[in-house]
Amino acid sequence: MLFRSLVLPALVAVTTSDADFLVMVKPQFEVGREKLGAGGVVRDPALRLAAIEEVARSAWEMGLGVEGVTASPLPGPSGNVEYFLWLRRASAQLSRERAEIAISQGPR
C-alpha cells in the first residue's frame, strides 16, 4: 500500500514523460497484514494476483500502462514471491491473463 500511495506518485512526478519504470511488487506489503501467512509470507496465488493488479491499477490511474510483467526468479528471504512490472506511458493496461501467466510461471 505504501508503494501505491507514496512511492509511485513521487516517481511519476519527478520523471519525464518518456521514462520507463521497473518496479518490484512485493505482495507482502500490498495485501495487508491480516492476509499474511506464517512468517509474513503471501502463499495464496489469488492474493499475489490482487497485489499485482492493484499496483497496475494505481499506475494506470497515474497514466502508466504495463509493458511487461514477470515473477522474480528468486523468492524473498522468507519465501515471498515478488514480481516485476515494467511501466511506461502509452502502454496498455494490464490484463488479468498476463498477470496470471506471471504468477503461474514464477516460483511456488
Segments predicted by a language model, with ranges:
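Short, small-residue-biased leader/transition segments that mark boundaries at the very start
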Residues: 1-2
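Conserved S-adenosyl-L-methionine
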Residues: 64-75
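Short alpha-helix
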Residues: 48-62
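Residue-level signal for inorganic ion chemistry
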Residues: 26, 79
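A short glycine-rich, Lys/Arg-flanked "PGG" loop and its adjoining helix->strand segment in the class I
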Residues: 8-22
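Flexible, glycine-/basic-rich loop-and-beta segments that form/coincide
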Residues: 81, 85-108
